[in-house]
Amino acid sequence: MYFQILVLMSEGYGRSLFSEKHFPHDRQLLPPFTTTMSLGSFFSFPASSAFFDRKKDDGVIDNPNVELVNRNLWSTFLECGTEMIITKKGRRMFPLVKLKLSGLDKNSNYTIIMEMISVDKLRYKFWNGNWIVAGVGEHHPLPTCFVHPQSPRSGEWWMTDGVDFKMAKLSNNPFNNDGHIVLNSMHRYNPRFHIVRADSSGQPILASLKTFSFKETEFIAVTAYQNDVVTKCKIDNNPFAKGFRNIDTVRKRKMNQIISTPPASEDEEPEVKRTKSEIEAVMFSDPKVPQMSLQLISQWQEALLSTIVQIPITNQKSSSERKSGFGVVDLLGSS
């Protein structure tokens, strides 16, 4: 028989970990408090096992330690206030969380978990270049953890290859079934990382649980970037955003080509890119009727009328007109 155990973690958090440049009143707004958060993952344990008692251990001696590999990159974002996009389908984090592990027992298996913790109970908004408090934060009872898909693995494997959470996605959809981390927009979070040793059957040994966190990884969840500085920082550092880096240069080059390249003829003008409003105006404007000469219109009217009332049509063209071509009557024939 198996039971589902929900591990509850409690930890106190103080004031902001963001730069005071973007949270100038942080000292007064965020007094220390203690909160209880769910680890966000249920583990199945045999009813007869000793895992219910956190004091019991398997006798393995280890000293887990975690280092944030890309600390400098995270620090760069911290200076301008890191923002992470959340979507209903889920969005990957950037910067990625990359960890280096040490002090693990080489022959024991370990499970690595990333959990998102609310830094405070407040909701924020970006105003006048700074994040300010907009009110009381929303209640967040949903799981906010991501178990690394390679878990459990041996301590030797973790220490050799390290850990990254590139597969973790952030979402604002509480009904998603894809295992995404569900967060509230305009709330502040900081991930913490749990290392727990597993037995031969893959079940975690709770007594071995160790937790780590880094001040540099704090961020605000948003549905769209609020700070232009953050947007530029992500474009400059994200290898998948290199297509956006030279967009201004490309635009300037195209404008210079239009200005410097003369038209092919006096009647030809350089093509000007239309705006969205101009395109919509053309799409929804009244259709234009092509202009026809009065002579051609009268020929059509006379020809159509003759087919209805069967009035003979006399073709009274001069010899000069016949040489120049034929009219509508010639196409329809005469009676």
Curated annotation (Swiss-Prot):
<dbReference type="Pfam" id="PF00907">
    <property type="entry name" value="T-box"/>
</dbReference>
<protein>
    <recommendedName>
        <fullName>Putative T-box protein 7</fullName>
    </recommendedName>
</protein>
<dbReference type="GO" id="GO:0005634">
    <property type="term" value="C:nucleus"/>
</dbReference>
<dbReference type="InterPro" id="IPR008967">
    <property type="entry name" value="p53-like_TF_DNA-bd_sf"/>
</dbReference>
<dbReference type="InterPro" id="IPR046360">
    <property type="entry name" value="T-box_DNA-bd"/>
</dbReference>
<dbReference type="InterPro" id="IPR001699">
    <property type="entry name" value="TF_T-box"/>
</dbReference>
<keyword id="KW-0804">Transcription</keyword>
<dbReference type="GO" id="GO:0000981">
    <property type="term" value="F:DNA-binding transcription factor activity, RNA polymerase II-specific"/>
</dbReference>
<keyword id="KW-0805">Transcription regulation</keyword>
<dbReference type="GO" id="GO:0045893">
    <property type="term" value="P:positive regulation of DNA-templated transcription"/>
</dbReference>
<feature type="DNA-binding region" description="T-box">
    <location>
        <begin position="73"/>
        <end position="246"/>
    </location>
</feature>
<dbReference type="GO" id="GO:0005667">
    <property type="term" value="C:transcription regulator complex"/>
</dbReference>
<dbReference type="InterPro" id="IPR036960">
    <property type="entry name" value="T-box_sf"/>
</dbReference>
<keyword id="KW-0539">Nucleus</keyword>
<keyword id="KW-0238">DNA-binding</keyword>
<dbReference type="InterPro" id="IPR018186">
    <property type="entry name" value="TF_T-box_CS"/>
</dbReference>
<dbReference type="GO" id="GO:0000978">
    <property type="term" value="F:RNA polymerase II cis-regulatory region sequence-specific DNA binding"/>
</dbReference>
<dbReference type="GO" id="GO:0006357">
    <property type="term" value="P:regulation of transcription by RNA polymerase II"/>
</dbReference>
<dbReference type="GO" id="GO:0001708">
    <property type="term" value="P:cell fate specification"/>
</dbReference>
<dbReference type="GO" id="GO:0000785">
    <property type="term" value="C:chromatin"/>
</dbReference>
